Design a protein with these regions (language model features):
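Conserved, structured core segments of small domains
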Residues: 1-100
Length: 100
């Protein structure tokens, strides 16, 4: 299962991280343990795509966002383009059950 994780750390955490090489190291190690498939960072936000086999694994991977980044991440299901045809077919089957 893939998930898109969006987070927005408080400004004081961002400022602290810019000033502290030790905090930068800790955050870098936490991101490595998370093993994101992809990551993007902007001035205000961060985005990760993570692949997990269970929800408890998702919780473990996202723990750094709660504790280090002091943020409440937004978590959305994600899928690759190779999975899109099956997803659309399944949605069509389910829609027909309800007369659409």
């Amino acid at each position: 299962m893939k998930f898109l994780v969006e987070f927005n750390p408080p400004i004081d955490m961002k400022n602290d991280m810019e000033k502290s090489p030790e905090l930068q190291k800790i955050v870098g190690e936490a991101i490595e343990r998370m093993k994101p498939l992809a990551a993007w960072f902007t001035l205000r936000y961060g985005f990760f795509v993570v692949d997990v086999n269970s929800y408890d694994e998702l919780t473990r991977k996202l723990a750094p966002l709660f504790h280090l980044f002091k943020s409440d991440p937004k978590i959305s299901p994600a899928f690759g383009l190779d999975e899109f045809p099956k997803l659309v077919a399944t949605l069509g089957e389910e829609a027909r059950k309800y007369g659409y």
